[in-house]
């Protein structure tokens, strides 16, 4: 019984000879196909193992355009270039040296009423264009006390050609008579009125007025005052009006000294761009700023009186002291000066 049971659970053994015979009986082309498939799979596996990671393509460098190179962008991104330029401009502006001390020349020793001092001049200097801030010497060209009360004299002294003519005469006098004779023999006498002196550099001017109540006010002018034959305004947006205002510091919350009774502060009124009525002058008056027939600063031909209105050109307040809610302020001129900023040659 045990023998029969063992025979029943055993699996039938496959005859090795028969299997080998069956394999041999398969067609040869099928065996060849299997071998080819196996070899291809081995090659794919070996390639996948030995395959190196693909390198990412390098970005293509674009050549900058001609206008881009002029602007300094080159092949860089415009946004990054603008950021770099802005940072460089900020850093360069912060590296500017401080302005040198200001020198005021032209006062005579006998002049008693000097309207412009260093504090007021520096307040004006901080607001003028940077190219004129570099000049540390301001020259007095007209003074009511030194040159007399005359509008024509004011126009003549403010003319840069007249100033240059005086400068050349002064230099010739300093060099001596013999040197001037030799120069006239070589190049001719250039001091005669028929020669026209063209200034090589531009200048700007500061007008300072002091009235009978000791108020100081005036204007910064981009051009010299001159008589205009036709009603035509001149000057540019660099001009502005200014005044020195008296106030009571004890009424301020942040006042340092509550016992102080009166102080003076500088106020400027810049060009608004609403209109171009900046400067107009003729043989009858000088007007700076105008709207609706009212001038920010008006001086009559006598140089003894004037009036100030609030005008749209500068958006200014009344320059001289006036009652509250007044529409204009009239004044009597006690002193008047014109200063030149910039060199003549």
Swiss-Prot record:
Membrane-traversing stretches: none
Principal location class: mitochondrion
Residue ranges, annotated region (Disordered): 1-98
Compositionally biased tracts (Low complexity): 68-94
GO terms classed as biological process: response to oxidative stress
Domain TLDc: 114-342
Any one cellular-component term (Gene Ontology): nucleus
Primary role: May be involved in protection from oxidative damage.
Protein's recorded name: Oxidation resistance protein 1
Organism, as annotated: Candida albicans (strain SC5314 / ATCC MYA-2876)
